[in-house]
Amino acid sequence: MGYRAHVCTTYRVQYGTGCFSAGACDAVNRLLENYEYPDGDGGRKSLVEYCDAEETVMELSREGLGSLVASLENGEAPEETDAVLDAGYTREDLISVFREWLDSSDKSHGFIRIEWF
């Protein structure tokens, strides 16, 4: 626990066209919230490190999202993937968006912050 609060001044949301439709929002959130990846000690860790009550702000483990991408590429998709596919997206769409998040997010952090709006 720290002794003083400090504000992060360099982390900003990149406004643009965004990813996924409103109809896929819940399905993508379920996929992210339920995915667990190996922690290196024989256990598993949650991909989502933080999620606000409205599920509009999420912080994802960079390592965990990379693990999810690898699983999708290897055909080892979690069952929650089906709901995203039913919303009109392909496995390749998921991989592409998640890779974009990995590539375009601030790499000085171990997490990736996404916001739904």
Q: Which residues fall in each region the model found?
A:
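Acidic (Asp/Glu-rich) sequence patches and key acidic residues
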Residues: 1-110, 116-117
